[in-house]
């Protein structure tokens, strides 16, 4: 896939985050782009709606701090019939991962962090971690790093996709002692998690042992959330818009 297509795909998916008050509108030509080519986007997106592949789409393209294309088609909600508007909000789930990782790499380019920095340097809640192996707690071979957060190899887990002793501790920390997690219930009613901020998350799972030695396994985890907490700490800004 060409880089331009990848960037366009990300632009479509990440609309709520790139549409910032810091951007201004301009003609495509002012930003070195083609009005003719950009005009092909709307009918292409409309076809997805007409073919029943999605109920609505919002697209935005910006270059050099100027928005040159911003359109919304279709509905936001089938049940209510609400249409997508310029300020509609979207739940994008794991598409926050490229946003968070990009923000971290910007800080890396600015010299604010190093990929092999230990996470405990920024979040002392993760200092002197233990690892639960065969029911016994052992010392971690090394403090897990920002690089390992980015690659899901830090020793963390997610808490809701498995039932290991560490997963169970995550669930108790995030949802309470007797909570039974259910994806359908979350989709219908929202999460009942007691975690409201990234700082809450760090405080909750910081004391919990690692599930495996850092750098030895790939396990889908809350590592990108922890990366977000580091970004907040370094930048002194909240991660959300």
Where in the sequence are the language-model features?
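Bacterial N-terminal signal peptides that target proteins for export
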Residues: 1-7
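Flexible glycine/proline-enriched surface loops and loop-helix/loop-strand junctions
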Residues: 84-88, 184-187, 206-214, 223-226
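Active-site SXXK
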Residues: 39-46, 65-67, 88-119, 224-235
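Active-site helix/loop module of the DD-peptidase/beta-lactamase fold
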Residues: 91-95, 109-165, 207-209, 219-222, ...
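Short, conserved catalytic-motif segment at the N-terminal edge
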Residues: 25-92, 112-114, 128-136
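Short, charged, amphipathic alpha-helices and their helix-cap/turn boundaries
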Residues: 71, 120-121, 164-211, 238-241
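Boundary at the C-terminal end of the N-terminal hydrophobic targeting segment
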Residues: 18-20, 26
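Bacterial N-terminal signal peptides
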Residues: 7-16
């Amino acid at each position: 896939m060409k880089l331009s297509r990848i960037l366009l795909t990300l632009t479509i998916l990440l609309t709520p985050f790139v549409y910032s008050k810091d951007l201004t509108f301009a003609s495509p030509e002012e930003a070195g782009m083609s009005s003719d080519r950009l005009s092909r986007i709307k009918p292409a997106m409309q076809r997805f709606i007409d073919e029943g592949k999605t109920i609505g789409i919002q697209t935005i393209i910006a270059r050099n701090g100027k928005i040159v294309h911003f359109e919304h088609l279709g509905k936001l909600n089938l049940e209510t019939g609400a249409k997508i508007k310029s300020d509609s909000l979207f739940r994008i789930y794991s598409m926050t991962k490229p946003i968070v990782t990009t923000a971290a790499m910007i800080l890396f380019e600015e010299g604010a962090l190093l990929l092999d920095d230990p996470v405990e340097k920024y979040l002392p809640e993760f200092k002197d971690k233990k690892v639960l192996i065969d029911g016994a707690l052992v010392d971690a071979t090394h403090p897990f790093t920002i690089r390992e957060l980015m690659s899901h190899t830090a020793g963390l887990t997610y808490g809701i996709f498995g039932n290991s002793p560490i997963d169970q501790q995550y669930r108790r920390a995030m949802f309470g002692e007797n909570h039974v997690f259910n994806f359908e219930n979350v989709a219908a009613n929202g999460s009942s998690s007691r975690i409201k901020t990234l700082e809450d998350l760090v405080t909750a799972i910081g004391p919990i042992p690692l599930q495996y030695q850092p750098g030895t396994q790939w396990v889908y985890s809350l590592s990108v959330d922890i990366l977000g907490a580091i970004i907040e700490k370094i930048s002194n800004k909240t991660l959300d818009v």
